[in-house]
Amino acid sequence: MLVVPARLHRWPPEVQDLFGREGPLVLEIGFGDGRFTAELARSRPDWLVLGAEVSAASVLRALRRMRREGLANVRLYHGQGPFALRNLVLPGTLDQVIVNFPDPWPKKRHQERRLLREAFFRRLSTRLKPGGSLLLTTDHEEYFRFALEEAERTGLYRVEVRPPPEAHLRTKYALKWKEAGRAFFHAAFIKLREDPAPWPPLRRYDVAHALLSGELPQDLALEKTPVRLKEGVAVFLEVARGKEGFYVLTHVEEEDLTQDLLLEVRKSARGVYAGVSRFGSPLITEAVKGAVRALVDRLEAHGLEVVQDHT
């Protein structure tokens, strides 16, 4: 029921491989505690519902709910919606996207963090079927108007402003705002045409490591300052000494993907190994390779020399 992208053999996977059968595919971005997701899956057992949520606590609550209710037509992903859209959905296969009460990021300096921007609508068009749609429900009028303008700017959608369906007002936040007497806004963004720019899945790699000659340092002091990468940023958060060497807790951010993973520096039969630990099923991306390269640079500063480089 929980989708772990690193364990998928293919990106994006076939619907059959993800769900075990074919059917109309729906993506819910930001499912919270999963109560709307569960209601949707119960009411439309023929639908296949893929949910994306950034909160680990919410994902856990939703997983428990789906298992408790025995909902076999739901798959949940812990991470950002655009990542799921890009890497878990094949082009032209998505029937509907549902976005209920997204974070409005009301401050002007934070508006680039908003989900429903022009670039997102353009990319979404590559995944929706002809006539597929995105349904937005929000209590934030300014965000609602912003989303309408961003979609209309693409020329790829017909926008229909409608009363919100009752089911969309039974989410955790909707019930809270309803008690507070807030107004709600709802629109359907229906695909008319597709953006010509392709949106291929994120490139991933099997390995990211290097072999070095020299002695393993007695100490590996790594500053907690951001390492700027071409694809994003990495921060070495903490170093722990083990029997064979060091483990480095590393935070890596890139477009639509944030990972906390372990890098390791240890003795091997052929020298000193520096690379990604497989603990936690990390995704080896260009940014992760860049983080390993930055770690190797620190080791070179300790006098080690690279003899094999797969970063």
Swiss-Prot record:
Q: Which reaction does it catalyse?
A: guanosine(46) in tRNA + S-adenosyl-L-methionine = N(7)-methylguanosine(46) in tRNA + S-adenosyl-L-homocysteine
Cellular compartments per GO CC: tRNA methyltransferase complex
Provide the active-site residues from the annotation.
Answer: 103
Residue ranges annotated as coiled coil are none
| Alphabetized UniProt keyword annotations | Methyltransferase, S-adenosyl-L-methionine, Transferase, tRNA processing
Q: Which Gene3D superfamilies match?
A: Vaccinia Virus protein VP39
Q: Which residues bind S-adenosyl-L-methionine?
A: 28, 53, 103
**What pathway is this protein said to act in by its record?**
tRNA modification; N(7)-methylguanine-tRNA biosynthesis
Which leading EC class covers this enzyme?
transferase
Which SUPFAM superfamilies is this protein grouped with?
S-adenosyl-L-methionine-dependent methyltransferases
Q: Which residues bind substrate?
A: 107, 139
Query: GO terms for molecular function, please?
Result: tRNA (guanine(46)-N7)-methyltransferase activity
EC annotation from Swiss-Prot or TrEMBL: 2.1.1.33
- Outline what the protein does: Catalyzes the formation of N(7)-methylguanine at position 46 (m7G46) in tRNA.
**What family does the entry list?**
Belongs to the class I-like SAM-binding methyltransferase superfamily. TrmB family.
State what protein this is by name: tRNA (guanine-N(7)-)-methyltransferase
Organism per entry: Thermus thermophilus (strain ATCC 27634 / DSM 579 / HB8)
Q: Which gene encodes it?
A: trmB
